Amino acid sequence: MSWQEKINAALDARRAADALRRRYPVAQGAGRWLVADDRQYLNFSSNDYLGLSHHPQIIRAWKQGAEQFGVGSGGSGHVSGYSVAHQALEEELAEWLGYSRALLFISGFAANQAVIAAMMAKEDRIVADRLSHASLLEAASLSPSQLRRFVHNDVTHLARLLASPCPGQQLVVTEGVFSMDGDSAPLGEIQQVTQQHNGWLMVDDAHGTGVIGEQGRGSCWLQKVKPELLVVTFGKGFGVSGAAVLCSSTVADYLLQFARHLIYSTSMPPAQAQALRASLAVIRSDEGDARREKLAALITRFRAGVQDLPFTLADSCSAIQPLIVGDNSRALQLAEKLRQQGCWVTAIRPPTVPAGTARLRLTLTAAHEMQDIDRLLEVLHGNG
């Protein structure tokens, strides 16, 4: 089989399964409205949970940062790309979340890959929730360590896997809020079992940070858990992009030596770090509390109105509200019908989610209004 035949076969298989991914160029993709092909849609696919991507204070901070520092960092943080803006953001994040150190990364994917690649050796074991994000599971699969997956949120199964003899160290990996189901991990129980077996806990709280807990401190703070490794991302609750790893001083020093994604990548622009500092200030403020309260009310309204639809509603109190349809083609058809009626909704299919669980992944944000939720419910009921 030639290279072209190999590529064609893979694409043909995706098409046959109604699983071919496509991108749509949009004129506006974050916030309440999505604009594509000169048409405006209510946007129920954005991860901009607090509606901060267009916040004037954050936009102003980015502009001022660009005027002060330029539009790029100029290099890796190990060479010339670590500015006083990066340093200030790291210190503010560490203080906010109660850690000694924070290290910035260009994306959550890079942060997860970097930590696992740097920390894990052949004699070690990774025990991951089987529904963990692709960045975590891919990094674990590529590492020299043994990878074992426990049944989603099943602490008993986790304990059984941890009890199996391991010559090295054990790292338990999970998410705070799961990206495709919107449910939360029982972090207190997971941490207890992990500590009983002398392991470390790594939590990716991409979808909880900024959105839940006191001052938006996220899933771990809400559940009174402090994992050894906490990954937070800035493309969801913060409304920007990038990520950080929160850890001890010695782990931070270790990652600065051995995390190749950090060492060999150009760091985020200092202007972006300034925007993130402004976003953090909003998240921690009374305004941040008000946005979280509004989002919670929108979620309650949606869940109350969707109960009698012929879909499986995930057990989620988060901004992620999936409606599990099952069949790939049915999910695609529903998403298209909703778009035709002015609601931009994305169909998520395998391999992103398990086979037979294709879904409409609906996301609600503080930028929405109650009438937007009512319109979504009206359209869903008309197509259920």
Swiss-Prot record:
Gene Ontology process terms (BP): biotin biosynthetic process
Record keyword Ribosomal protein present: no
Residue(s) carrying N6-(pyridoxal phosphate)lysine: K236
Residues annotated as binding pyridoxal 5'-phosphate: G108, F109, S179, H207, T233
Cofactor(s) recorded in Swiss-Prot or TrEMBL: pyridoxal 5'-phosphate
Superkingdom per UniProt: Bacteria
Listed EC numbers: 2.3.1.47
The entry's keywords: Biotin biosynthesis, Pyridoxal phosphate, Transferase
Gene Ontology MF annotations: 8-amino-7-oxononanoate synthase activity; pyridoxal phosphate binding
UniProt keyword Transferase present: yes
Binding positions (substrate): R21, H133, T352
Cited Pfam families: Aminotran_1_2 (PF00155)
Region forming the signal peptide: none
Entries under InterPro entries matching the protein: Aminotrans_II_pyridoxalP_BS (IPR001917), Aminotransferase_I/II_large (IPR004839), AON_synthase_class-II (IPR050087), AONS_Archaea/Proteobacteria (IPR004723), AONS_Proteobacteria (IPR022834), PyrdxlP-dep_Trfase (IPR015424), PyrdxlP-dep_Trfase_major (IPR015421), PyrdxlP-dep_Trfase_small (IPR015422)
Top-level enzyme category: transferase
Annotated pathway: Cofactor biosynthesis; biotin biosynthesis
Reactions listed under catalytic activity: 6-carboxyhexanoyl-[ACP] + L-alanine + H(+) = (8S)-8-amino-7-oxononanoate + holo-[ACP] + CO2
Similarity field: Belongs to the class-II pyridoxal-phosphate-dependent aminotransferase family. BioF subfamily.
HAMAP family to which the protein is assigned, alphabetical: BioF_aminotrans_2
Subunit-structure text: Homodimer.
Functional description taken from the UniProt entry: Catalyzes the decarboxylative condensation of pimeloyl-[acyl-carrier protein] and L-alanine to produce 8-amino-7-oxononanoate (AON), [acyl-carrier protein], and carbon dioxide.
Protein name in UniProt: 8-amino-7-oxononanoate synthase
Naturally occurring in which organism (per UniProt): Shigella dysenteriae serotype 1 (strain Sd197)
